[in-house]
Amino acid sequence: MTYVVTDNCIACKYTDCVEVCPVDCFYEGENTLVIHPDECIDCGVCEPECPADAIRPDTEPGMEDWVEFNRTYASQWPVITIKKDPMPDHKKYDGETGKREKYFSPNPGTGD
């Protein structure tokens, strides 16, 4: 099992989760984070840290797409281990559905 970052992180990008990860498996895009599913050790410490409830176990129904999404972008984006401020309008987007289709950017973030 692994954990994956899902839709609600997009356009919010809280980074509370990255500082608690013992294996540094979070990667930063321009407006979201992802977890490298092959590096995640399934410890679960990141899940309760996410204010947007965007981190889910891959065993939940419908997570297959998110596993591949996370794997794809983790191989392209820089690692992030230090907490940063969320996106400027994060409160506006938190909880909105369909954010991947509306707002996702494939551009990398800056990393640490």
From Swiss-Prot:
Cofactor stoichiometry and binding remark: Binds 1 [4Fe-4S] cluster.
Domain 4Fe-4S ferredoxin-type: 2-30, 31-60
Annotated stretches, region: Disordered: 85-112
Residues that bind [3Fe-4S] cluster: C9, C17, C50
Alphabetized PROSITE patterns for the sequence: 4FE4S_FER_1, 4FE4S_FER_2
Binding site for [4Fe-4S] cluster: C21, C40, C43, C46
Keyword annotations: 3Fe-4S, 4Fe-4S, Electron transport, Iron, Iron-sulfur, Metal-binding, Repeat, Transport
Domain of life: Bacteria
Matches recorded under Pfam families: DUF3470, Fer4
Residue ranges, compositional bias (Basic and acidic residues): 85-103
One example GO MF annotation: 3 iron, 4 sulfur cluster binding
Cofactors (names): [4Fe-4S] cluster; [3Fe-4S] cluster
Reported function: Ferredoxins are iron-sulfur proteins that transfer electrons in a wide variety of metabolic reactions.
Protein name (database record): Ferredoxin-2
Source organism of this protein record: Rhodobacter capsulatus (strain ATCC BAA-309 / NBRC 16581 / SB1003)
